[in-house]
Amino acid sequence: MFDLHKFSLRAQEIIEAGGFLYGAGWSPATSSNYSARIDDANIAITVSGKHKGRLQAQDIMVVDLQGRAVASQMKSSAETLLHTVIYDLKPNVGAVLHTHSVTATVLSRALRPNTEIVFEDYELQKAFRGVYTHEGRCVVPIFDNTQDIEALSALSVEYLKEHSDCPGYLIRGHGMYTWGETMAECLRHVEAMEFLLACELEMMRIKS
């Protein structure tokens, strides 16, 4: 089993994150899914189909790192595996956020057939953990959207094993995944990623 107090704390973090992300326009309607680590074996995650701007305690459930529900009959997102593989691969990660902003959706489509986006010489790259200067490249992969979540999760794991400094990834025409050691850090990464994606989209407009 899991610690109920820790679950309650993580659930509250998820609820507050949902209010912020919905308010920013990055998680419209019932899109997106959020999670936070409870312990080495379990995570708290949003129940499927819930409005992320109006989350309540009963909208958060527990799954193990294989994505199986723990002490619950509720159903988590079909994309739960995309969360659990990150926790399994990165023991230091404490939160994972999947958002559906207009910028991430449009830019990932506009860059087709590119399989990555490169941020370079932006001051805000320093918002990502482990980045201390703008003088460098931050590469974010773009994976094609698919209903085959097992295949997509395997693809993400393969990439992240080879690029341990990667701060997140895009799913083309779908949205973005980011993570952090804490929920606060994860939210910072979302904000930074959204800013940088918006800058890249604006640069494309200027150049066209």
UniProtKB/Swiss-Prot annotation:
Entry's family note: Belongs to the aldolase class II family. MtnB subfamily.
GO molecular function, one term: methylthioribulose 1-phosphate dehydratase activity
Names of required cofactors: Zn(2+)
Keywords: Amino-acid biosynthesis, Lyase, Metal-binding, Methionine biosynthesis, Zinc
Entry keyword annotation includes Glycoprotein: no
Pfam families given in the database record: Aldolase_II
One GO term (biological process): L-methionine salvage from methylthioadenosine
Catalytic activity: 5-(methylsulfanyl)-D-ribulose 1-phosphate = 5-methylsulfanyl-2,3-dioxopentyl phosphate + H2O
Biological pathway: Amino-acid biosynthesis; L-methionine biosynthesis via salvage pathway; L-methionine from S-methyl-5-thio-alpha-D-ribose 1-phosphate: step 2/6
Official protein name in the record: Methylthioribulose-1-phosphate dehydratase
Keyword field contains Protease: no
GO cellular component terms attached to this protein's record: cytoplasm
Function (record text): Catalyzes the dehydration of methylthioribulose-1-phosphate (MTRu-1-P) into 2,3-diketo-5-methylthiopentyl-1-phosphate (DK-MTP-1-P).
EC number: 4.2.1.109
Enzyme class: lyase
HAMAP family in the record: Salvage_MtnB (MF_01677)
Cofactor: binding comment: Binds 1 zinc ion per subunit.
